[in-house]
Amino acid sequence: GCNQTEKAMSNSKITVEVWSDFMCPFCYLGKRNFEKALERFPEQSAVNIVWKSFQLNPNMVTNPNISTTENLAKSKGWTLEYTRQMSNHVTQMAAGEGLLFDFDKAVVANSFNAHRLLQFAKTLGKGDELKEVLLYAYFTDGKNTDDDETLFALAAKIGLPEQEAKN
């Protein structure tokens, strides 16, 4: 009957795998939207989120001297004005979700090392925390998330063991 179904639901876990990249604004927006939906889900404690690593551009060369806006314009063959309009639209979408994006401050960074750190953080049950601080550091603070010192500081911020994080 119904009670058996309810009991089965309360004992089972729902695993949601999320494939995303730290340099993708829509991944950050999707994360926030998913979290808001999860807050309304009566069985949210039964949901296990597994962050998977996906690089949108594995060949991206880190360049802290160019903004993501400039890089996107160059890579797509768009004008800087058009790219800023696109970025402003995404920034407004983010603001609607309580996020602050600054594409002119965000730097072009290969996300491989950030993903390596995420996989390590997951082994210590800190994947969710690291995911959030990395996205915030990239989109809001304009941090170079391919820089070792930046990654170590973010790891320390959420309590990851320093020496292990450096490996």
Language model: regions and residue ranges:
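C-terminal cap of thioredoxin/glutaredoxin-like
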Residues: 5-6, 11-21, 26-43, 47, ...
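Structural alpha/beta surface segment adjacent to cysteine/selenocysteine redox centers
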Residues: 32-138
